[in-house]
């Protein structure tokens, strides 16, 4: 049984930086980590790859040969990977004995909530290699500063969760920079817990662009609340406590926390519940740490 993370998110959300930082953190914890780069457009990697899709196919070659743009080229690459899944399986098998796997995916979001190739690749790997994976979706925290962008990020997160069908952790990345993006309309816990979205209506009406689609946005918010699946944790990749809290969540979601444990059902339950870590207190501490200067200016 092999554990790992599927790192996804829009362009610029910090996926490659996350993989690099998470790899270093887990290595310090004593885990052997292998990063699998499945982004054929990422040719400036800050980490050493265990597997690199560029050995199979390159985006620039696809664009040149088939006269495709970047998005069409990435879709082609994922379809090509799906058809050549044996190549990826053969590359992963030597790592299965003792490695924790990080999959670094492209940032084109349509690959994760519309197109099926990425989902099919992961499904085949999970079945053939007995993988236990958690999808970690990174959302840049600056999107919280704009109500319309925040609702869009919620809709993206929900759509991806439903489409990928994996244990899922949504992350507001770059939380250390949130104080520089501008003042939030509400406390940070409003955005992490996805509280009553009707409170956003007033702020949406202040923006002429959002006001035009006010009714549509209201209906989308209703869909998000009806499913009640989306919430966020926060991440400062340079802060070991922040990364450690995220690792705990991921380990619970993919079952790593139970690996190698021979215990009764009662003991498993104790481990699963663990020591109570109140989200409100944790998020309040994050707000105080990273948004203190903004509050002083007020």
UniProtKB/Swiss-Prot annotation:
GTP binds at residues 12-17, 173-176. InterPro entries: Gpn, Gpn2, P-loop_NTPase. Its EC number is 3.6.5.-. Keywords: Cytoplasm, Cytoskeleton, GTP-binding, Hydrolase, Nucleotide-binding, Nucleus. It is an enzyme of class 3 (hydrolase). It is found in: Cytoplasm; Nucleus; Cytoplasm, Cytoskeleton, Spindle; Cytoplasm, Cytoskeleton, Phragmoplast. GO terms for cellular component: microtubule; nucleus; phragmoplast; spindle. Small GTPase that is essential for the correct formation of the tangential divisions in early embryos. Associates with microtubule during mitosis and may function in the positioning of the division plane. May participate in the patterning of the early embryo at the octant-dermatogen transition. Is crucial for normal development of the plant. This is GPN-loop GTPase QQT1. The gene is QQT1.
């Amino acid at each position: 049984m092999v554990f790992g993370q599927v790192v996804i998110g829009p362009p610029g959300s910090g996926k490659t930086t996350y993989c690099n930082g998470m790899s270093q953190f887990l290595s310090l914890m004593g885990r052997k980590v292998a990063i699998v780069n499945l982004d054929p457009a990422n040719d400036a990697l800050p980490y050493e790859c265990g597997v690199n899709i560029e050995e199979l196919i390159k985006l620039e070659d696809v664009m040149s040969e088939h006269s495709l743009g970047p998005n069409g080229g990435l879709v082609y690459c994922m379809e090509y990977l799906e058809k050549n899944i044996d190549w990826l399986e053969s590359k992963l098998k030597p790592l299965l004995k003792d490695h924790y796997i990080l999959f670094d995916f492209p940032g084109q979001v349509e690959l994760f909530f519309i197109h099926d190739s990425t989902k099919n690749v992961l499904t085949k790997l999970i079945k053939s290699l007995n993988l236990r994976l958690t999808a970690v979706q990174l959302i840049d925290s600056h999107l919280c500063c704009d109500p319309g962008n925040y609702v869009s990020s919620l809709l993206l997160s929900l759509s991806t969760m439903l489409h990928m069908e994996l244990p899922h952790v949504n992350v507001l990345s770059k939380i250390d920079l949130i104080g520089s993006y501008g003042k939030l309309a509400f406390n940070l816990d409003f955005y992490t817990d996805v509280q009553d979205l009707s409170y956003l209506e007033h702020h949406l009406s202040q923006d002429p662009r959002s006001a035009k689609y006010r009714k549509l946005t209201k209906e989308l918010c209703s869909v998000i609340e009806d499913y009640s699946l989306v919430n966020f944790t926060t991440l400062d990749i340079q802060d070991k406590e922040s990364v450690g809290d995220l690792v705990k969540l991921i380990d619970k979601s993919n079952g790593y926390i139970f690996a190698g444990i021979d215990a009764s059902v009662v003991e498993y339950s104790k481990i699963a519940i663990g020591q109570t870590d109140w989200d409100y207190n944790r998020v309040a501490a994050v707000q105080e740490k990273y948004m203190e200067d903004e509050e002083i200016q007020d």
